[in-house]
Structures are given as C-alpha cells and as structure tokens.
C-alpha cells in the first residue's frame, strides 16, 4: 500500500503546473514521481487539443487519462482512445452563422479530435495557432467533419464580451461559454467543462470524488475547482479564482505542485 493509493491529483497546465516558459520544474517533476511511486494517480486538465497535448507527454509524468479541450474529452493516450466525451457537434453551426453575420472578422476555430480548423481567421487566431504549434487550415463550416469537439472565438476583449452577451441572449442553455483568456471564448457542449470531466475521470478510474484533488489558476478552471472540496490555486491565480477561496499554494514559478504534494505527504 502506498501513501497516495486511491488519490487522483488533477492539475491545470499553463500558469499552474508549467513555468512561464512552459516547462515543468525539476522540483515539480521529482514530487510527481514520488507521488505516483506511492500509488497516486496524476493527470492534467487543459484547454489544449489532443495534438497540442501530445508533445508534452514526452516529459510530463502522467499515469491517468487526460482532460483535454477544456473538458469536452477525457482521453487515454496510452490506450489511444477517448474514455468520455461531450462534443459540441452540429449545434456549432448556428453559432458560426450568427457570429459571421453580426460580428464579421472574429476569429473562429473548431476541432475534430486530431485536426484544427479556422472557420474565420484574424491576427489573434493566427498568433494562437503559432503559439500552440498546431497545423491548421482555413475552411468553410461544411468542410469540417462532424462532430465538432468544440469552438474557440478569438477577438479583442471588449468586442468578445459583446459576442458572449449576444450568444447568451440568442441561445440560452445551448452552449457552455467560458473565457480561457481575455481574448479567447470557449464554446462547448452544455455538459462539457473541466469539472464534469474530472468527475467522469474519477468514475472511470474507480476513485471516490472525495479523493479528488484539483489545482488551477484561470477562469476556465473554476468548474475544476468547484467540483471537489479539495481545491487549490497557485498565488498567481486570477481574482475570480481566488474569490472561490481554494487553498492557496506558492506561485507557479515556485513549484506549486511540489508544495501541494509535500502538504499531502505530511498529512499521511
């Protein structure tokens, strides 16, 4: 029996597990290896796509399926299959036509499991694809096979707020809308978010939700942090996250995950 048998630790990537240069510190790496050697299950919950996540697997110590696409999919990279998913599907078409008509010039991305598409591009969307190192192509919506996993709207902050308000007015309850950055608005199936996916992962692994520990810093981590009583945030977390009063950890540049594992270790 290991110290951490029956525990699932689920962390956000950027701003939480990774440094500002998008690497994992030796301190976090050593702590995670110890955590898993003592029976703990560790994975991440990220807005990244399946291809965008794959290159991290070379150096991230993960021993459980991964929550990707901000909670639309739980993917087992070892088995090569999704173990749970709530894709956006054809409902994204209505949203596309409204945004294209009323807010022309807005960047719109959508995804199959392995491929990224730009339905409409702008400087923000082009910069996004460059940053995440994903190949993409500009296409019409009819060229993207169904089901779409999710959509991402990319626009200046003030205009994006107007788009969000208009979508909520036109399509009440049809989508889960969530900022992942001030210029990024995620559009998901209404049952898709990091928290729902985290609980689905617990069920898949046979781990009680009482033993789920989550860590995140951004607005797209709110459901991840409210789905369990064991929620933590690094000191650099956004104000909306800090307002939830999760337990606070050091800044993500100061090895927040290692600090959490040390806390769990001391309690056992």
List each model region and its residues.
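Asp-based phosphoryl-transfer active-site loop
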Residues: 5-21, 225
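Active-site phosphate-binding/coordination module
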Residues: 21-125
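Residue-level signal for inorganic ion chemistry
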Residues: 35, 70, 151, 225, ...
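Short active-site oxyanion
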Residues: 39-43, 62-64, 150, 210-211, ...
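Phosphate- and divalent-cation-binding pockets in alpha/beta enzyme and binding domains
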Residues: 52-55, 162, 197, 223-224, ...
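Short, structured coil segments at secondary-structure junctions
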Residues: 60-62, 69-70, 78, 171-173, ...
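Conserved acidic, metal-coordinating active-site core of Asp-based
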Residues: 102-215, 219-227, 236
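Asp-based, Mg2+/Mn2+-dependent phosphohydrolase catalytic module
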Residues: 227, 231, 235-268
């Amino acid at each position: 029996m290991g110290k951490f048998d029956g525990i699932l630790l689920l962390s956000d990537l950027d701003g939480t597990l990774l440094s500002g240069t998008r690497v994992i510190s030796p301190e976090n790496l050593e702590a995670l290896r110890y955590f898993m050697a003592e029976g703990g299950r560790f994975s991440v919950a990220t807005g990244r796509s399946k291809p965008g996540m794959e290159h991290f697997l070379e150096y991230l110590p993960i021993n459980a399926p991964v929550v990707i696409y901000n909670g639309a999919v739980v993917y087992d990279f070892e088995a090569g299959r999704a173990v749970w998913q709530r894709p956006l599907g054809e409902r994204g078409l209505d949203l596309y036509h409204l945004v294209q008509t009323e807010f022309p010039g807005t960047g719109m991305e959508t995804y199959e499991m392995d491929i990224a598409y730009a339905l409409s591009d702008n400087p923000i969307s082009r910069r996004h694809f460059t940053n995440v190192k994903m190949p993409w192509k500009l296409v019409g919506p009819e060229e993207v096979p169904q089901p779409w996993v999710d959509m991402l709207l990319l626009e200046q902050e003030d205009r994006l707020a107007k788009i969000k308000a208009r979508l909520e007015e036109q399509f009440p309850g049809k989508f889960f809308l969530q900022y992942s950055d001030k210029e990024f608005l995620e559009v998901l199936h209404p049952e898709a978010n990091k928290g729902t996916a985290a609980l689905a992962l617990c069920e898949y692994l046979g781990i009680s939700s009482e033993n789920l520990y989550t860590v995140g810093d951004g607005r797209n981590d709110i459901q991840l942090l409210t789905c369990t009583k064991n929620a933590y945030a690094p000191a650099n977390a956004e104000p909306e996250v800090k307002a939830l009063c999760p337990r606070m950890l050091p800044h993500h540049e100061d090895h927040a995950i290692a600090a959490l594992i040390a806390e769990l270790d001391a309690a056992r």
